[in-house]
């Protein structure tokens, strides 16, 4: 609101909130740091879990950063940016979501200290940009190259990703499944390995133990055989995939058929039966003994299929049809008349089995499957969900290493190395930007410090010890949280893909820079309906307080 000759001028609607300059920066930094603090205690093998209960009473128990932030109903716009950091990290690298968010929060904390010293945001932004670019170069220089057939390294990296999750007791077993699954679906393109993780299906079923989780060289479908008279088990299966219905189609035009005698009705029904029999005869003629249909199967068609000893499954999801095609080598056919023996896929066995009291179709023993399934088992829904998240992380980590062929040491070793190298680089740059680069270097120490804190160690004492050992013994020295002492992370098998770390630093610095650029927040007033819904709900406005120092 401005005032001219005593007349108030309303520029923004009534009820609009506005924060300018340092107030806006302080508020945004606080919101982002609260998010970072929320996930910080989950970091590392000794990290704690979060229990999230939604408005319907559904419970999620996890220590996966991306899942925690995705499940939380976050209102503040700056806090939402931190959620985007986690989502980007998850999409691009598959692991390191908590690391990225914690680093972003610490970068903002250090930036606030510089702002309090009257250093302009533009200078901090320039320093952070230089530091982020230099960090990418340093990570490339310290990364160790690995061959795709180095099973031991892939296994250790997968185990590192699973460590700290609920499935930790079976981490070696699950890591083996993840490595085998990724290697089966990996394809060579232009001399490089490429992995489409959509070709690895994770199917969950409660019951049994985590150890009962298994890899199927093929596809598992949560469906059952359509007719009780059909065989439940077919060996040396010849598989047809049809994305149309095995039914007589209705015409799109509003046509009417006038039947004036019982003979005409009989002829009509016989013609319908003949059409359905021709469809089934075509399937039998090409040599198929298993058929998966994306749409429905008429009762009469089911009868003929059962009569010919053909196993049929209907209403199969499009994504499952595509996986079946990749696993068995079959081609998906739209028109049944076009079906040929060349369109059929092969599998050693197609069988309907009971899993946790429900029927499922197993298509296994495929010769060179480019789609596989991991059937996840566990005692409760929460265990099964957490095993799924652990496997997702492990699969993505193995994918990163196969595609990039580069690894670095975990356990805070790479962050300490970056911190030391960036301190040296800051002196070369000089000027006020030097302060920002030094702040960036200091912020990276939050990872080893947090690992120590979450393990119940003295963070300052541990950090001093580790940095001294790191400078003396080399760049792979990090924190062994089990022993509470500095150790060679490569020797201990704590390995991460370089892509995870590069993306974490890139995402964190970009988010911090974006938040630092904001010097004005204009928030429109909420709609009346929203206000009514919030009464008594304790919903916080943008302004908030926290016990963060």
Curated annotation (Swiss-Prot):
Annotated GO MF terms: ATP binding; ATP hydrolysis activity; ATP-dependent protein folding chaperone; unfolded protein binding
Entry annotated with the keyword Glycoprotein: no
Region (Disordered): 528-549
CDD domains recorded: cpn60
Alphabetic keyword roster: ATP-binding, Chaperone, Nucleotide-binding
Signal peptide: none
Start-end of Low complexity biased regions: 540-549
Domain of life, source organism: Archaea
UniProt feature, compositional bias: Basic and acidic residues: 528-538
Pfam families: Cpn60_TCP1 (PF00118)
Subunit description: Forms an oligomeric complex of eight-membered rings.
PANTHER family cross-referenced by the UniProt entry: CHAPERONIN
Main function: Molecular chaperone; binds unfolded polypeptides in vitro, and has a weak ATPase activity.
Family membership noted in the UniProt record: Belongs to the TCP-1 chaperonin family.
Protein name: Thermosome subunit
């Amino acid at each position: 609101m401005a005032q001219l000759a005593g007349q108030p001028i309303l520029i923004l609607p009534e009820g609009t909130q506005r924060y300018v300059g340092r107030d806006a920066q302080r508020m945004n930094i606080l919101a982002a740091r609260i998010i970072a603090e929320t996930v910080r205690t989950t970091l590392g093998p000794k990290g704690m879990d979060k229990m999230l209960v939604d408005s319907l009473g559904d419970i999620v128990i996890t220590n996966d950063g991306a899942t925690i932030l995705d499940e939380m109903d976050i209102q503040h716009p700056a806090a939402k940016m931190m959620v985007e950091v986690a989502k980007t990290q998850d999409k691009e690298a598959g692991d390191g979501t908590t690391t990225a968010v914690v680093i972003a929060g610490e970068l903002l904390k250090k930036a606030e200290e510089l702002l309090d010293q009257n250093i302009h945001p533009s200078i901090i932004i320039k320093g952070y940009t230089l530091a982020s670019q230099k960090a990418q170069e340093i990570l490339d220089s310290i990364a160790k190259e690995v061959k795709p057939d180095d099973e031991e390294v892939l296994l250790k990296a997968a185990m590192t990703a699973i460590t700290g999750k609920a499935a930790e007791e079976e981490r070696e077993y699950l890591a083996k499944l993840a490595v085998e699954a990724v290697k089966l679906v990996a394809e060579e393109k232009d001399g490089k390995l490429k992995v489409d993780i959509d070709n690895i299906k994770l199917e969950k079923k409660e019951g049994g133990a985590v150890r009962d989780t298994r890899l199927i060289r093929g596809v598992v479908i949560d469906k059952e055989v359509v007719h009780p008279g059909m065989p439940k088990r077919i060996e040396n299966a010849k598989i047809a995939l049809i994305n149309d219905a095995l039914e007589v189609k209705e015409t799109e035009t509003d046509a009417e058929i006038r039947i004036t005698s019982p003979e005409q009705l009989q002829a009509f029904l016989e013609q319908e039966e003949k059409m359905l029999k021709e469809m089934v005869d075509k399937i039998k003629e090409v040599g198929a003994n298993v058929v998966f249909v994306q749409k429905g199967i008429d009762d009469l068609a089911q009868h003929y299929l059962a009569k010919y000893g053909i196993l049929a499954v209907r209403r199969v999801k499009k994504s499952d049809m595509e996986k079946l095609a990749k696993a068995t080598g079959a081609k998906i056919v739209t028109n049944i008349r076009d079906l040929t023996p060349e369109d059929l896929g092969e599998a050693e066995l197609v069988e309907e089995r009971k899993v946790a009291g429900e029927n499922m179709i197993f298509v296994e023993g495929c010769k060179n499957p480019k789609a596989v399934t991991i059937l996840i088992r566990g005692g409760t829904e929460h265990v099964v969900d957490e095993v799924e998240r652990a496997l997702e992380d492990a699969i993505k980590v193995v994918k990163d290493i196969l595609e990039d062929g580069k690894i670095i040491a975990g356990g805070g070793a790479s962050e300490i190395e970056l911190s030391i190298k960036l301190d040296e680089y800051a002196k070369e740059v000089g000027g006020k930007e030097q302060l920002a680069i030094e702040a960036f270097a200091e912020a990276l120490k939050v990872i080893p410090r947090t690992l120590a804190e979450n393990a119940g160690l003295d963070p300052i004492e541990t950090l001093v010890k580790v940095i001294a050992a790191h400078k003396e013994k080399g760049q792979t020295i990090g924190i062994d949280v089990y022993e509470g002492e500095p150790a060679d992370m490569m020797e201990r098998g704590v390995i991460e893909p370089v892509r995870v770390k590069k993306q974490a630093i890139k995402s964190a610095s970009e988010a911090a820079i974006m938040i630092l650029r904001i010097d004005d927040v204009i928030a429109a007033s909420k709609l009346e309906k929203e206000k009514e819904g919030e009464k008594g709900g304790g919903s916080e406005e943008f302004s908030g307080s926290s016990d963060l120092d």
